[in-house]
Amino acid sequence: MKKRSNVAVCRKLIVLVRPLTGFMLAAILMGLAGHLAAMFLTILGGYAILDAVGSYAGVGMKTALIVAGLLAFFRGILRYVEQACNHYIAFRLLALIRSKVFAALRRLCPAKLEGRDKGNLISVITSDIELLEVFYAHTISPVAIAFLMTIVMICYIGHFAWQLGILALLAYLLVGIAIPLFISKQSKNDGMQIRTQAGELSSFVLDSLRGLPEILQYRQGEKRLEEMNRRTDRLMEQEAHLKSVAGKNTGLTGAVILLSDTVMLLAAGLMCKNGTLDFSFALLAVIALMSSFGPVTALANLGSTLQNTFAAGNRVLDILEEEPVIEEVTGRQPTPSFEGAKAEHVDFSYEKEPILSDFSMEIPKNQIIGVIGKSGSGKSTFLKLLMRFWQTDAGTIQISEKSIDTVNTTDLRRMESYMTQETQLFHDSITNNVRVAKPDASMEEIENACKKASLHDFILSLPKGYETAVGELGDTLSGGERQRIGLARAFLHDADLMLLDEPTSNLDSLNEGVILKALKEEQKDKTVVLVSHRESTMRIADCVCSVENGRMS
């Protein structure tokens, strides 16, 4: 994780506001006007009291009461508009950030996401992004409002006596800057530790739910629950510490405000006693300071409340700014069709662990190429390289007599269908799960693909047929049924090159025969690379290649 200062995180998050600058300016102006209205309600009360006791200070009682009534009326409207603008900005930007994060994950996938903690990713996508609402709705405009309010009130108090203006400035600096800086140092790492622990807890819970059958089978439920409670307690302790700091912040802020008011009262009283300041002006200056701490108090609270938000922002920025292993290829000469593939002297390693070494293979058009080998020999890795999910360390891979690095990514995806060993299913109907491979596919096309995958009859036996929901991760289906949905996707995609990784490993011999027959029939206008351990599956191959220790043998 890249370590950024809070200022750097703040600057990068503010840049995202640019498309909504108009709404942000409206929120600041409405907020400024609203706070001024609230403050001058009290100040006008002071003018009215002074007029009532015969010490006219420039505004009569009648005028003060009329203006105060108008300010009270408009205060509610201004506050509503300010909050509406702030939350419109916040929710629009949260949607934009989610879109950017999903685009970044798509760009990083699969090379940077293989082995990544999925629970932590879910935590970033959900709760971390949601925490940014505090920054966009309750931080940017309040900071600007506090800055502008400080200037206005210093000028107003200072016009009675410049010495009182200096006292007001010192009070605002203490409450709005010194206290947040002091408190933020005390809770410096709390926010990041809380977000990290929350992500780890989310991952632990997700793993526990997915592995629930194994946990129950091996009687690990109690042990797993104890670990979950331990992690939860540790997270709660961290949150309690942050809340304790927030409590200190509130107490310190209140004490400084009380001290500032007292000093202002004493200074104004002393000047009044010495005859350098009129009593009415002294009273108005004290009232003005006492009623003006609202905006800067909001700044004081940021020292503790923003630690979680900045930590969340840092985690979100990690995803947005992470560089992908593979960049999409665009703007190259189109590759209209698949005319064969070739790998020459390819080397590839996963994090310095050699997988393929001097690997070469030719894949002629309209043939079925079988690939066999022990687990870990590099068979599946070769298919991923053909999909350009990874970059080779050495050697070349050609598609249609072009280097794979020069083929437009859209052309490559159109020409290739890839079925992995584990079929990922979504909590949706069978129809929509198959349609993933071709979003505009007709129902007839989906049914034909399912027939080729020996899935059609099974689907019709279900109460809701093709509209049957498969459950989360396809947990209502057997391994073989999930695998056949993956095959149906590959058939529906109708690509020139089919890359099938163990397509029949979970199937009985009857379903295997139906699928192999369908693949053989597809051979006239398709090329198939078939990875399997089964000798029966390899019978349809025109050529069988053996991979051993990352080499052809």
Predicted segment positions?
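Short intracellular "coupling" helices and adjacent cytoplasmic loop segments at the cytosolic face
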Residues: 2-4, 85, 91, 99-123, ...
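Helix-loop-helix
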Residues: 51-66, 156-170, 248-314, 319-320
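Cytoplasmic coupling helices
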Residues: 84-103, 144-145, 168-213, 220, ...
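Membrane-integrated ABC transporters
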Residues: 1-37, 58-63, 82, 86, ...
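ABC-type nucleotide-binding domain
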Residues: 336-553
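An intracellular "coupling" helix at the cytosolic face of ABC transporter transmembrane type-1 domains
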Residues: 14-22, 107-111, 127-136, 140, ...
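Transmembrane helix-loop-helix hairpins at lipid-water interfaces of multipass membrane proteins
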Residues: 21-78, 160-163, 276-279
